[in-house]
């Protein structure tokens, strides 16, 4: 879920803090990408529906390969444009997220029932809609994505807990310039810059939305803690919402009362019921001090692609087209060996006018530096896989 309604609220209230960009603008930038979010996007995007059947991208053996094909081609596209993606994977979800995870499980069950109902009624449109809501990416598929990225030479980071928090930590410690995710809570975790739509395919033709935390805070007048309180009040993954509190009421409430405590105290108890499980202090502390691997302990390295390993994994095991894989490897090598100019802002200090892309944000919070494992990075591109085949659900 991220933070419910935050994106639209920021467009309404702090439009100057959001910029629409093309992919090529991020030439030379290291971007920490929420891997789970990206993989789900690829799987859903490649899921089709034909003649009453769910259709997924598969190889000749019938194995689903959309997660690998999606990561392979989108990563190649980013590398072609000069980006340097760093993929960050979720670890163990925090206890605070248990209720949200149960809600997601229930929504998936509801979608399954709606799918069967639509099937009986012959409603293909509803069946396609519900089939996308039923998409789940298993642990084995995620491990395959990690294997592919390492063989490509792309850095892989395993977060101890939430990937967005680990991505934000990499930005805070200058290991990455921005976080790439659809979940707005990357801002609540303190990322100076956040990019949405980064992993969208060309077919969607949507510009990348670039959010700047320091400009959001400046335009809103919020402190970092007040911004976190706003995110909690809007609805996040760690506490239930207070029914009846919309985005603009939440904004005005934090502006007027200065804190979540004072705002809650002001509420009319006969009109608004604060859920018993509304442990907002725990949620606030988690945003301020998430469980992450300290950024300075993570070594980000982009490496040469392992051609032999890629052929073995993608062609021999996953039955991808060898020709397409080899072309992908060559694209990657071309991008890596190409002599390119560095970004000007890496060599000169640029005086900030009113709005500056590289502005520094005050970021709150320390980390609980617990048992995280940083996986060695690798870099490279891959080619796609097989053909579309019907997979009955």
Curated annotation (Swiss-Prot):
Enzyme class: hydrolase
Positions of Mg(2+) 2 binding: 183, 185, 237
Protein keywords: DNA damage, DNA repair, DNA replication, Endonuclease, Exonuclease, Hydrolase, Magnesium, Metal-binding, Mitochondrion, Nuclease, Nucleus, Phosphoprotein
UniProt keyword Iron, yes or no: no
Location of the region described as N-domain in the Swiss-Prot/TrEMBL record: 1-108
GO MF assignments: 5'-3' exonuclease activity; 5'-flap endonuclease activity; DNA binding; magnesium ion binding
SUPFAM superfamilies: 5' to 3' exonuclease, C-terminal subdomain, PIN domain-like
Basic residues bias spans: 384-393
Entry PTM: Phosphorylated. Phosphorylation upon DNA damage induces relocalization to the nuclear plasma.
Region of interest: I-domain: 126-257
Gene Ontology BP annotations: base-excision repair; DNA replication, removal of RNA primer
UniProt region (Disordered), positions on chain: 99-127, 358-393
Pfam families named among the record's database cross-references: XPG_I, XPG_N
PROSITE patterns found in the cross-reference section: XPG_1, XPG_2
Residues of the signal peptide: none
Compositional bias of kind Basic and acidic residues: 99-120
Described function: Structure-specific nuclease with 5'-flap endonuclease and 5'-3' exonuclease activities involved in DNA replication and repair. During DNA replication, cleaves the 5'-overhanging flap structure that is generated by displacement synthesis when DNA polymerase encounters the 5'-end of a downstream Okazaki fragment. It enters the flap from the 5'-end and then tracks to cleave the flap base, leaving a nick for ligation. Also involved in the long patch base excision repair (LP-BER) pathway, by cleaving within the apurinic/apyrimidinic (AP) site-terminated flap.
Protein's name according to its UniProt entry: Flap endonuclease 1
Naturally occurring in which organism (per UniProt): Trypanosoma brucei brucei (strain 927/4 GUTat10.1)
């Amino acid at each position: 879920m991220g933070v419910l309604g935050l994106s639209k609220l920021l467009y309404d209230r702090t439009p100057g803090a959001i910029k629409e960009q093309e992919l090529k603008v991020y030439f030379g930038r290291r971007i920490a990408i929420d891997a789970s979010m990206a993989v789900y996007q690829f799987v859903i995007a490649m899921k089709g529906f034909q003649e009453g059947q769910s259709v997924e991208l598969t190889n000749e053996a019938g194995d689903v390969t959309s997660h690998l094909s999606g990561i392979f081609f989108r990563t190649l596209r980013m590398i072609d444009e000069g980006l340097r993606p760093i993929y960050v994977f979720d670890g163990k979800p925090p206890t605070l997220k248990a209720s949200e995870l149960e809600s997601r499980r229930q929504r998936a069950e509801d979608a399954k029932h709606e799918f069967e109902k639509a099937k009986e009624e012959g409603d293909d449109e509803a069946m396609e809609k519900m089939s996308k809501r039923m998409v789940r990416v298993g642990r084995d598929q995620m491990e395959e994505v990690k294997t592919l990225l390492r063989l490509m030479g792309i850095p892989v980071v395993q977060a101890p807990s939430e990937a967005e928090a680990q991505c934000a930590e990499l930005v805070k410690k200058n290991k990455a310039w921005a976080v790439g995710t659809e979940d707005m809570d990357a801002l609540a975790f303190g990322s100076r810059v956040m990019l949405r739509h980064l992993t969208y395919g060309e077919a969607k033709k949507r510009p990348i939305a670039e959010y700047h935390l320091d400009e959001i805070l400046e335009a809103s007048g919020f402190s970092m803690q007040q911004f976190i309180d706003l995110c909690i009040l809007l609805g996040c993954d760690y506490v239930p919402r207070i029914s009846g509190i919309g985005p603009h009421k939440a904004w005005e409430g934090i502006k007027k009362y200065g804190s979540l405590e004072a705002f809650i105290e002001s509420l009319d108890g006969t009109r608004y019921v604060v859920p018993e499980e509304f442990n907002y202090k725990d949620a606030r502390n988690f945003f301020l001090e998430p469980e992450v691997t300290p950024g300075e302990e993570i070594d980000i390295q982009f490496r040469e692609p392992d051609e032999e390993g890629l052929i073995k994994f993608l062609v021999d095991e996953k039955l991808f087209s060898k020709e397409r894989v080899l072309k992908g490897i060559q694209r990657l090598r071309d991008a890596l060996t190409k002599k390119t100019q560095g970004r000007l802002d890496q060599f000169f200090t640029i005086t900030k006018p009113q709005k500056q892309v590289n502005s520094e944000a005050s970021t709150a919070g320390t980390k609980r530096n617990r048992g995280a494992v940083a996986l060695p990075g690798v870099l490279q591109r891959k080619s796609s896989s097989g053909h579309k085949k019907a997979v009955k659900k």
